[in-house]
Amino acid sequence: MSLSGAHKAAFRREVTQEGQVFAIRDANGFPAPADDEGRRAVPFWSKPTRAQLVVKHVTAYGGFEVVPIPIEEWLGDWMVGLEHDNLLVGINWAGARATGYDLTPGQVLRWFAELEPTAAADERIHSVQR
């Protein structure tokens, strides 16, 4: 498994255990840097310590604060908003350049729906795909 794949697997496991995700923001809001192909992603982490390492070691994110987001809010409002804005979801970015695995909001919802045996997950997927 690649390092990005390992971060992806850890993300789902840890978010499920923690019940929340972690983002970073500064006075300008949440970052959404573009990759080499121009696609933008908002990064999220499964543990505050992962996000804190990026803030501490990646110059571009110096001064950002780590913000917890309850998983229900993240899978609901956040995924709808990211889909609307055509943004990807960065998963446990790490390293000197804060890079990693990116998913579409729909992929994230399907990924977490596998763990959630309720109709609520299906409804969120359908609302994002509309």
Sequence positions of predicted segments:
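Conserved NAD+-utilizing ADP-ribose enzyme module
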Residues: 1-130
